[in-house]
Amino acid sequence: MTMFVESINDVLFLVDFFTIILPALTAIGIAFLLRECRAGEQWKSKRTDEHQTVFHINRTDFLIIIYHRITTWIRKVFRMNSPVNDEEDAGSLLL
């Protein structure tokens, strides 16, 4: 019985790791990348090639979108793990 409980705890830890911890670490990493991108924009010379500027903006926008999706995912996982309110539909919490 003890081995069964330990294996369930291990499985629950892996579920929490892949649904909360790993996305949170990814979001933190993306936040650091965004900070570096924005700091780099301040020091850019005004003679940058137009293509490089567009590529840089697209990369920054992509990081912002990914960061937003990950933080939204984490919020939904937390809401799914908490008791559902009567006003809230459980189906709206699913991705």
Curated annotation (Swiss-Prot):
It is a single-pass membrane protein. Changing T71A: Reduces misCB/yqjG induction in misCA/spoIIIJ mutant. Changing H68A: Increases accumulation of full-length MifM. Signal peptide: none annotated. It is found in: Cell membrane. The chain crosses the membrane at residues 12-32. The keyword Transmembrane applies. Its main location: membrane. The keyword ATP-binding does not apply. Residues 86-89 are annotated as: Crucial for elongation arrest. One of its GO terms (cellular component) is plasma membrane. Keywords: Cell membrane, Membrane, Transmembrane, Transmembrane helix. It comes from the Bacteria. Sensor protein that up-regulates translation of the secondary membrane protein insertase (MisCB/YqjG) when activity of the primary membrane protein insertase (MisCA/SpoIIIJ) is limited. Acts as a ribosome-nascent chain complex. When the primary membrane protein insertase activity or level is reduced, the membrane insertion of MifM is impaired, which induces arrest of MifM translation and unfolding of the mRNA hairpin. Unfolding leads to translation of the downstream gene, which encodes the secondary membrane protein insertase MisCB/YqjG. This is Membrane protein insertion and folding monitor. It comes from Bacillus subtilis (strain 168). The lineage of its organism: Bacteria, Bacillati, Bacillota, Bacilli, Bacillales. The gene is mifM.
